[in-house]
Amino acid sequence: MAEMDDNVVYVGKKGIMNYVMAAITQINKGEKEIHIKARGRSISKAVDVAQLLKNRFESDVTVENVDIGTDEVEADEGGTINVSTIDIAIKKP
């Protein structure tokens, strides 16, 4: 099993505030930079998490970098499908 990074919040099917609170927890632990990552339909939720974090909860954080890409995932029927990805780097001074 892959080891989870402490400074990464993986966005999925849960509510947005769960991920915002996870990011705030990482910042309060002393992380200077966190990454909000998502794939597919969760990309818009990851953007919402970053914006809520920046505009409502931690006004001194900045969006350092946004990486977009594509992952190849094995389909249930065989073969591969392309899934879009996003990685939003948030930095606290």
Walk through the language-model features, giving the residues of each.
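Short, hydrophobic/π-rich interface segment
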Residues: 42-69, 73
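C-terminal edge-of-domain segments
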Residues: 64-93
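Histone-fold modules and their flanking histone-like tails across chromatin and transcription assemblies
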Residues: 1-27
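A generic structural signal for short, solvent-exposed coil/turn residues
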Residues: 1-3, 28, 58-60, 80
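Ordered, soluble secondary-structure elements with a strong preference for glycine-centered loop motifs
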Residues: 10-14, 37-40, 47
